[in-house]
Amino acid sequence: MKYRDLRDFLSLLEEKGELKRITFEIDPYLEMTEIADRTLRAGGPALLFENPKGFDMPVLCNLFGTPERVAMGMGQDDVKALHEVGKLLAFLKEPDPPKGFRDLFDKLPKFKQVLNMPTKRLSKAPCQEVVLTGDDVDLTKIPVMHCWPEDAAPLITWGLTVTRGPFKERQNLGIYRQQVLGKNKVIMRWLSHRGGALDFQEWCQKHPGERFPVSVALGADPATILGAVTPVPDTLSEYAFAGLLRGNKTEVVKCLSNDLEVPASAEIILEGYIEPGELAPEGPYGDHTGYYNEIDSFPVFTITHLTRRKDAIYHSTYTGRPPDEPAVLGVALNEVLVPILQKQFPEIVDFYLPPEGCSYRLAVVTMKKQYAGHAKRVMMGVWSYLRQFMYTKFVIVCDDDVNARDWKDVIWAITTRMDPARDTIMMENTPIDYLDFASPVSGLGSKMGLDATNKWPGETEREWGRPIVMTDEIKQRVDTIWEQLDIVK
């Protein structure tokens, strides 16, 4: 599924019945959240609120509200095809040189895709049709959603933040929520390990006391948005990955007030700076955990320029107890992660992050066990291989006869193949999401690994149980007469 920008993608969704235009007057204060939440839980379409109360700018919600729409946004026909995206990322992370002419021929499609990686720089762009500076910059004219009753203020949720550290050539793209402080100021909530925060930290070391340039794109094309939340290799820019997904180069334009490049087709661009040392208390906000988070201090982003399309659309979402849009994204991106893990750990059969576990706090792994202690090695690998899993609190490892995505199967393995003392690993003082108020210290907590695999010699002195399985002959015999028995309708 190919498209050029967000509007092109919305047209494709509308053709497929995956976009609902709402002409009723709907308030960005709480009402949009309730409507979007009910729609998402029902597996409904993306929503375009064309008449937000008090504003003349439409609001787009629930864009990635189903795994199928996430797949479409990544240029794929269905969710299963996301495995191919994962295979491509695994290849780019650790490319294998061709072993011969035949292997070279087989790899040609991947090499052809790589040709779409460089960005295309434009001198004029739709995102700069309207230019506002100084006192004309006014975020209160944008219908930023106030999502939950006890939220501190309206919250920008889908802002694609563009930064560049002083020691890096490529830009970093990240999604960080931004609390609106006033007409030209927001709070940039980025965690210390995220790319934008690391760029800022390095900038402060290299240029102490100097303002750090930042730009934020709202309403970028889906491939670029999804590239920012996908585990791309550190050597690959999110713009380059978006070009791979889209099948054509990502078009960018230089910002008016700094040297950063932003998606040319975006709806709205915020340009400005972060003053080192300028912090503000952020929150509380209802979050993907299903709770309001604690108040904490983060840098203030001052906006000097606001550029946009003439008829801009504001792209937004909400976060809350799963399922929400981030949880749906997690379900889809799970399919991308599996081939990346399998490239490093070929023994892994499947990997599953249940959305009820806040998309990353609990992982279930199934594997082909080959030796005593193998499950514990895989646990350690999951925690250390990708940054995305550094906050995963629980890792459950099962044999490949268990369906990682069937909780009944997993519970059976835990209760029949585990001794709690022998088969549980506990680690203290590890990185934990600061939103996890269950940890004893903000940002620091424990992890648990559960080895629910069959135990090998050396792991137990007991004779291990044999699973009960009916013979194939009897199964086939009953299959032939099952319908005639007329037992279950």
Swiss-Prot record:
Cited Pfam families = UbiD, UbiD_C, UbiD_N
Its Gene Ontology cellular component terms are: cytosol; plasma membrane
Subcellular location, principal: membrane
Q: Which residues bind prenylated FMN?
A: 175-177, 189-191, 194-195
EC numbers on record: 4.1.1.98
Which residues of this UniProt protein bind Mn(2+)?
Answer: 172, 238
Q: Which residues form the active site?
A: 287
Q: Keywords of this protein's UniProt record, alphabetized?
A: Cell membrane, Decarboxylase, Flavoprotein, FMN, Lyase, Manganese, Membrane, Metal-binding, Ubiquinone biosynthesis
**In the record's cofactor note, how is the cofactor described as bound?**
Binds 1 prenylated FMN per subunit.
- Disulfide-bond pairs as recorded: none
The record's listing under InterPro entries reads:
UbiD (IPR002830), UbiD-like_C (IPR049381), UbiD-like_N (IPR049383), UbiD_bacteria (IPR023677), UbiD_Rift_dom (IPR048304)
Q: Which reaction does it catalyse?
A: a 4-hydroxy-3-(all-trans-polyprenyl)benzoate + H(+) = a 2-(all-trans-polyprenyl)phenol + CO2
Query: Which superkingdom, per the lineage?
Result: Bacteria
Q: Where in the cell is it found?
A: Cell membrane
The Gene Ontology biological process annotation of the record reads: ubiquinone biosynthetic process
**Top-level class of the enzyme under EC nomenclature:** lyase
Q: Which cofactors must be present for this protein to function?
A: prenylated FMN; Mn(2+)
State a single Gene Ontology molecular function: metal ion binding
The pathway this protein participates in, as annotated, is: Cofactor biosynthesis; ubiquinone biosynthesis
Stored HAMAP family: UbiD
Q: Which family does it belong to?
A: Belongs to the UbiD family.
Function recorded in the entry:
Catalyzes the decarboxylation of 3-octaprenyl-4-hydroxy benzoate to 2-octaprenylphenol, an intermediate step in ubiquinone biosynthesis.
Subunit record text: Homohexamer.
Q: What is this protein called?
A: 3-octaprenyl-4-hydroxybenzoate carboxy-lyase
